[in-house]
Amino acid sequence: MSEQQGFTVWFTGLSGAGKSTIAEMLYHEFQSRGLKTEILDGDEVRKNLSKGLGFSKEDRDTNILRIGFVANLLTRNGVVTICCPISPYKETRDACRELIGEFVEVYVHATVDEIAAHRDPKGLYKKALAGEITGFTGVDDPYEAPEHAEITVDTLSQTPEESLQHVLTRLKELGRVDDDTVHVTGERVHSGLTDLRVSEAGTVVKEH
């Protein structure tokens, strides 16, 4: 049996877009296929490796670079590593890409208006849009969308299963997975985009 080749799948997108949902589904899909895989969630890294960091650009960059550092260690040791922080700044994402090398960027597209209308149960986007919360990514703090991501999914027009299938299909086209990893069955899809929560955009609420 050939040795597993590590690579990183890096999800980026606004809070509430669907990153954590699709990343977790992908993680379980890979596990079910016997791949060595780990998932690095932006909130969990903040809690365990980045305590004390705020939401200034410098602090956000530090958190993302720490995720990139850990992802690089895992990747070079043959682990398929899934990262799903907001990672709003292109320069920092590019730094992680350069560090890791074996890097696939997945842009999870959803607009602020769409998220505020459909996936904002605590009303955080509405408060940010009203000026009641400041430093909120996508509202008064920038989110620099990728222009050349290897994979793009639109979670407003796709079901979770469709988004996952598209990611797997593109990973096969990119030579990252084989045919045995591509087909998704309903039994392994365990969460939906209706469970999304606004997270890590200035006010931290766990995104399931």
Show the residue positions of the predicted features.
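Conserved lysine of the Walker
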Residues: 19
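Short linear proline/tyrosine/threonine-rich motifs used for host-factor recruitment
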Residues: 197-198, 204-206
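Small-molecule kinase domains that catalyze NTP-dependent phosphoryl transfer to phosphate-bearing small molecules
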Residues: 109, 117-166, 174-186, 190-192
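Extreme N-terminal, non-catalytic leader segments
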Residues: 1-8
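The conserved Walker
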Residues: 15
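Conserved substrate/cofactor phosphate-moiety recognition/catalytic segment
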Residues: 23-69, 76
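ATP-dependent NMP and nucleoside kinases share a basic, alpha-helical "lid"
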Residues: 48, 52-54, 71-129, 135
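Hydrophobic anchor at the beta1->P-loop junction of P-loop NTPases
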Residues: 11
